[in-house]
Each structure stands twice: as C-alpha cells, then as structure tokens.
C-alpha cells in the first residue's frame, strides 16, 4: 500500500470537521458582533444569552447533524476501500498458491468482523456526535460543553454593552482568541484531557486503518501459508523503529520484537505496517543499500538557528509549525467575524510571519512544504476575506 495514499485517507473527514469548527466559532463570533453593534444607548433591545442560545445552538446542532451524516458515509466508504485493497493484495498470494481468490472481504466472517469493528471505532468522535453537550471549547485545563461556553461568552458580551465599556472589541478579544485557539473538542468527563476534533480524527482513523491492515493481512496470510512478515520502510522514520523497517522476520520473531517495542507497530502515529510473506520466496522490497540510504536520511543532522536536529525531528517541527499557522488563520477568521479589525490585523501579521518562517525552515531542512496543512477553512456563515 502506498504511504501517501494511506496518509490522505482521512482528509475528507478532517476537512468536514474543520468546516464544522469554523462554522461554530464564526456563528458565535457573529453573535458577539451583532450584540456589539447595538451599543449602550440601545441596550434595552438586548435579549438574554439563553434567548440567543435558542436560535444559534439550534442552527449549530443542525450543522453538527449534517456533518455527522456526511462523515458516517465517508467512514463506510473509506474502510470499504481499505478492505478492498487488502483483498486485492491477498489474492496475489492466493492465486500463486493455486487457491480460490476472494471476491470480497464479506466472504470471510473474520474479515467482515474486522472491518465492522474498524468502522465503529472510527465513528467515535467523527460521525457519532449527536448533540452540543458532547463538544465544547477549552478554557484553562477544562473543556467546557458548548452550550455552557456559549452562554458564558454571550453573557460577557451583553454585560460589556450594558455597562458601556469603551472598547468592546478589545474587551471581547481574549474570548475570541480562546475559542479560535482551542477549536472544537470532544468533552471528556473522566480525564479532562481533550484534543481538537479535527486533529484526533486524523490520528484515530490512520491508526484504525493500520490496525485493519494488520488484522486482515494476518488472517489472509495464515490462509495462504505466510510464515513471516516484511516491515514497510519510509524516510523520516522515528529512531525507535529505524532498526526494524524494511526487514523481514519470521512470525515468531516478529511477535516477540513487536511486543518488546514501547510503541508497537502502527500505533501512536506510527506509519509502518507488516506485510505477510513466505520466507525464502518473497524478495525484499528494499536492497541493503536502499535501506541504508533511507535510514541515513532520517538520522541526518541539520542545523537551524543554531539548533541541531535530525531530519526526522525536523519533520516533527514542520508539523508543529503547520499547526501554528493554521491556528493563527483560524484566529484571523474569528476576528473578522466579530468585526475586530485590529485583532484581525494582528492575527494576519502573525500568520504571515509564521508562514515566512515555515518556508525558510523547509528550505534549510530539505523538507517539502505542505501548504494544504496550513490553510484555514472558513465556515459557511461568513464570507472569506
């Protein structure tokens, strides 16, 4: 399976969640702007935060339901596609063994159960959010449910207008920044830990895909008589997996090695997968020289602003910079939605400076820029500026 193909699988789902995030943030920001437009002289026209919440949260719940419906279909399609790729791969070995080829993963109960389980797990947080109590924004170390957060923010806006605060936009700026920087998160009552919906979706789906690959390959490999595995290899590999990538192992040896790893294959953002093989028959994908070149590139040191790091570490820095740029653009869009020209200008300058730094860093580190990972998706309620 092609690594870039695998990496792109969650894109549609992540984009849908990014769109939902921007819709919610900008819906609240538009309400903040409209309240500020009323002014102290007409403060008697203001409703309560709970009254505003009726219309706004109803619209948000409708958008949540729409996005969840689209994502549910996308999860179904995505894992069916992955399963189909696995079946086609396995059929190469079935035919070589003079065995009947699989027509579909549904022809095997075990394979069907793997796919169904992967779909159910992927739905969690990407396609099964049923109401606004399940999502919210981070404030300090807590994730506050959306309704509670909305009422708190709008109450603050109403109070500022009623008291005639001199600079309404400046007074509300910290709230807007907090929302934009947090992004929509799944409310976790137990641990208090949370991740943005879009970020966690990408990681969870990719881990689900790799787990499904592993399960299906192990099952079909057992059927066609595989007695070993070959580990995939890629550039910019983490140090803890560099010694195993691209190599072949017997099933027994691989089980022992994988269990000894602090980060087992395919988990915690690992991009590797194990392909079933017949030892002594299946030729290695990479020669020793090719594998040495790949590993050398991963460990090769670069220097940026006096700091030395491996090329792999540089790739992790690249991801962090992309996230920072995207969040700065989210902040810019939120400020535009509230009508805060100064706040929007500050956020725009910040994103421009981060983008320039990102370009310089990629050039010096020899990394390919990924502009698609730095974009902001403006929600449908606000025209892009």
Explain the meaning of each model-derived region.
Residues 1-265, 279-385:
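Domain-core detector
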Residues 268:
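Residues that flank catalytic or metal-binding motifs in active/ligand-binding sites
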Residues 272:
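Catalytic core of tubulin tyrosine ligase-like
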């Amino acid at each position: 399976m092609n690594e870039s193909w695998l990496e792109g699988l969650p894109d549609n789902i992540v984009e849908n969640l990014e769109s939902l995030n921007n819709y919610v943030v900008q819906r609240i920001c538009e309400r903040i702007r409209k309240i500020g437009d009323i002014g102290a002289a007409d403060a008697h026209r203001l409703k309560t935060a709970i009254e505003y919440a009726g219309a706004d949260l109803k619209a948000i719940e409708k958008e949540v339901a729409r996005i969840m419906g689209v994502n549910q279909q996308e999860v179904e399609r995505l894992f069916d596609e992955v399963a189909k790729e696995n079946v086609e791969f396995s059929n190469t070995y079935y035919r070589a063994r003079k065995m009947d080829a699989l027509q579909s993963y549904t022809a095997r109960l075990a394979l069907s159960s793997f796919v169904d389980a992967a779909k159910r797990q992927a739905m969690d947080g990407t396609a099964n959010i049923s109401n606004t109590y399940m999502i919210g924004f981070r404030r300090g170390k807590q994730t506050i449910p959306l309704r509670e957060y909305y009422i708190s923010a709008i109450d603050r806006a109403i109070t500022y207008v009623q008291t005639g605060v001199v600079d309404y936009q400046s007074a509300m700026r910290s709230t807007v920044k907090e929302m934009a920087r947090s992004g929509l998160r799944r409310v976790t009552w137990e641990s208090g830990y949370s991740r943005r919906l879009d970020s966690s979706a990408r990681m969870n789906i990719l881990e689900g895909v790799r787990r499904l690959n592993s399960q299906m390959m192990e099952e079909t490999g057992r059927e066609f008589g595989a007695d070993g595995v070959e580990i995939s290899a890629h550039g910019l590999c983490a140090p803890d997996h560099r010694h195993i990538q691209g190599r072949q192992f017997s099933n027994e040896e691989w089980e022992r090695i994988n269990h000894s790893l602090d980060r087992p294959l395919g988990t915690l953002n690992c991009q590797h997968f194990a392909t079933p093989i017949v030892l002594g028959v299946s030729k290695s994908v990479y020669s020793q020289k090719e594998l040495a070149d790949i590993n050398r590139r991963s460990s090769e040191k670069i220097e940026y602003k006096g700091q030395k790091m491996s090329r792999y570490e540089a790739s992790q820095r690249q991801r962090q910079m992309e996230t920072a740029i995207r969040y700065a653009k989210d902040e810019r869009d939120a400020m535009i939605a509230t009508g805060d020209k100064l706040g929007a200008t500050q956020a725009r300058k910040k994103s421009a400076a981060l983008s320039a730094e990102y370009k310089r860093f990629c050039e010096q580190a020899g990394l390919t820029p990924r502009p698609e990972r730095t974009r902001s998706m403006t929600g449908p309620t606000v025209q892009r500026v």
